[in-house]
Every structure is written in structure tokens, then in C-alpha cells.
Amino acid sequence: MDYQTFEKVNKFINVEAYIFFLTQELKQQYKLSLKELLILAYFYYKNEHSISLKEIIGDILYKQSDVVKNIKSLSKKGFINKSRNEADERRIFVSVTPIQRKKIACVINELDKIIKGFNKERDYIKYQWAPKYSKEFFILFMNIMYSKDFLKYRFNLTFLDLSILYVISSRKNEILNLKDLFESIRFMYPQIVRSVNRLNNKGMLIKERSLADERIVLIKINKIQYNTIKSIFTDTSKILKPRKFFF
């Protein structure tokens, strides 16, 4: 497999893991979800007094029901205001007051400090792709969301599926077991088992019981499966270039 293609997929996996672990850190610091923080960052960096709900949904990579739900939650928490257009009540606008803007700025400034501390503590500062502050973090996050959607709609694969295929193809001359996968990727054991079963049913890997010990599940791929994985990685690597969003 082409080295650059393999490295791009590896970076994709590393960046997703970074976002996952940083999100766990943020959950301990805030009573806000990552989606709520994204909307606050949206208003902070757009720096506009009032924005239509339609525009927000168009800019943020979440389905309409998710955006509406999180805007409603942020409104209850006093970060933003939601109102209907007087001329056309079907049009909903979201606005922030000067006081709310200061409140949002405090959250974003604190987030910048957390990201800086997290990078230093986990030694992420050595990676060129690691975000230095919240704006870079959310750009990275939205690129990951875009790439996950690509996997889902183009190949009917989850990110976990891709991670497993990466580990197996990187050690294609070995016969692995579930423990090898568990030690190589961030997901929990039951999630890995379900994904392996799904990939086995789709014919993308071979799962079999060890003859020496039937409790051990062995996983391998043949040449045809390797070529299929190679094709998926090649197509995926082409869409992993950074994209510009609303920032």
C-alpha cells in the first residue's frame, strides 16, 4: 500500500482519538456538551449580533434537530436568545447581547487554556496537526465529522470499522486476535467485537476460532480483502485534506 495513503489514514485515526480524549477532559470542566461549545464558538468567531437558524444549520455539520436542541439548551442556560421574525414567524433568529458575548468569551478563553494544558500534559505539542487554541480545534473537529460522514455514506463503514481495518492491514502477514485490536485502538472491547462481526459478515475480514483454544478468536485478511481495504484507504485519503468552514 502507498506509504502516504497509509500515513493519512493513520493521522485521521490519531486526530479522532485526540478529539475523543480532549472531549472527555472538557466534560469534566464544563456543564456543556461539545455540540454546545461548537455553537458558542460559532457565535464567538462569527462576531455577529443575530444569525438566522437556517444559516447556523447550513454552517454547522449537524442535522437540524441536533442544532435546534442545543440552541434551546444554550438559551435556557442564558448564553443566547432565540426569537421569531415578526414579518415571518417561520423564520427563527438566534442573537447574543453584549453581556452574553462576554460570557461566551470567558468560556472560549478558558477552553484555549484547557487545550494548551492538555497538549502539554499528553505531549501532543510535538504533532504539527495538534490545535493550539479553540478555533483550530473546532476546524479539526468539523473535518473529522465530515470524514466520518464520508465513510458512512460512501462505504457504509463506521470510524471503528476503519480503525480495525487499519490495524489488520498494517499487520497483514500476521494472524491477530481481539486482544491485539483492543490494545491498538481506543474503543471498548464489546464495541470491537460487534465491529469485527459486522466486517466478517460483509466479507472484509476473516474471523475464526483458534484450533488450540476455541475461546480465542483469530482475525486475518486474504489478498482480495487487502486490495479492497487498499482501495477504501485510497479514496478516504483523498478527502482528508483540511476544509474551510464558517470560521
UniProtKB/Swiss-Prot annotation:
Major site of localization recorded for this protein: cytoplasm
Keywords carried by this UniProt record: Activator, Cytoplasm, DNA-binding, Repeat, Transcription, Transcription regulation, Virulence
GO annotation (BP), single: response to stress
Induction: Maximally expressed during post-exponential growth phase. Repressed by SarT.
Chain residues forming the annotated DNA-binding region: 53-76, 178-201
One Gene Ontology molecular-function label: DNA binding
Claim: Transcription regulation is one of the keywords in the record: yes
GO cellular component: cytoplasm
Location within or outside the cell: Cytoplasm
Superkingdom of origin organism: Bacteria
InterPro entries: MarR/SlyA-like (IPR039422), SarA/Rot_dom (IPR010166), Transc_reg_Sar_Rot_HTH (IPR055166), WH-like_DNA-bd_sf (IPR036388), WH_DNA-bd_sf (IPR036390)
UniProt entry tagged with the keyword Metal-binding: no
Family under the similarity heading: Belongs to the SarA family.
Annotated NCBIfam families: Staph_reg_Sar (TIGR01889)
Function field: Positive regulator of RNAII and RNAIII in a cell density-dependent manner. It can contribute to the expression of virulence genes controlled by agr. May also regulate target genes via an agr-independent pathway.
Name this polypeptide is given: HTH-type transcriptional regulator SarU
